Amino acid sequence: MSSRSFGKLRINFVEGSSAFFLVTINEYLVTMHSRLWLFSSKLFWPALFIAVVVALTFLLWSGRSEKMSYCEMACTFEERLPSCLDSIREWNEGLAYFDSSVAATQDTLQSFKNLLWNFWDIEFAGAGLPSISEESVLPLRVLENKKSGCMGLSWLALMVAEARHLRLDAILLPGHVFLRYESSNEIFNLEPNRRGYSYTDDEYREKYKNGNWTGLEFQPLKTKEFVGLAAFNIGNLYLETDVPRALTWYRMAEEFFPAYPGIGVNQSIAKMRLPDSL
């Protein structure tokens, strides 16, 4: 047995295990409780739960040589075992539909689009807050509720691509992501908020020309970077209402996507909003 530390949270684990049932949190409980009591005792358990999720994510993926899994991270963000998709009926029925459609039509791209926007019938949640809520960002909730913004739909699509070895990337734009599908001889852009409509790169540049460009746009996001961006979006949901929780998500975002400038900016804002006694 060995241990790793994340701040004041120490996790003991057996080598080779996922460590989900071997978390030692006594010291962390006391520390977090004393700090969060000033806000409200009601904030303690949710904040602790999120902190453990983040620590477990670091434990599972920090320093690992293999590529991070979109599917496993979808489960981890929901405080489930990494293999949770095995028991989700709608997910498995969707993959079966995709496989049968490809076998019947030999059209992988259309089968992929039909899965997302016909079989699962995922709809755009709407502009503004509905599209950036946890219900619209976390892919397992998107699959359950059939509503999504660009992040949630893209994450779900990337999970399918991972499971079926499709060449699919998430592409960053100012405040947005879209999907890029590559076949043997063609490349297609898929707009997640418009049921896979294909804008050209030039059309995207025109649509987002007034956004905050970072230099990271139009480059395929690595899995860790996409997961970091999702953590950043979730942190933003709590920036006004639950600063400790926002900072916890920003810490994960910073770990996985350190090059994204918005993370540091919002972290600084959140830290300034903490009471002096914390």
Go through each PLM region and give its residues.
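N-terminal basic, low-structured, amphipathic or hydrophobic segments
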Residues: 1-6, 31
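Intrinsically disordered, low-complexity segments enriched in proline/serine/threonine
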Residues: 4, 24-26, 277
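Short Gly/Ser/Thr- and charged-rich N-terminal loops/segments
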Residues: 6-15, 19
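Short hydrophobic targeting helices and cationic amphipathic motifs
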Residues: 13, 21-22, 29, 34
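A structural boundary/capping signal
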Residues: 41-278
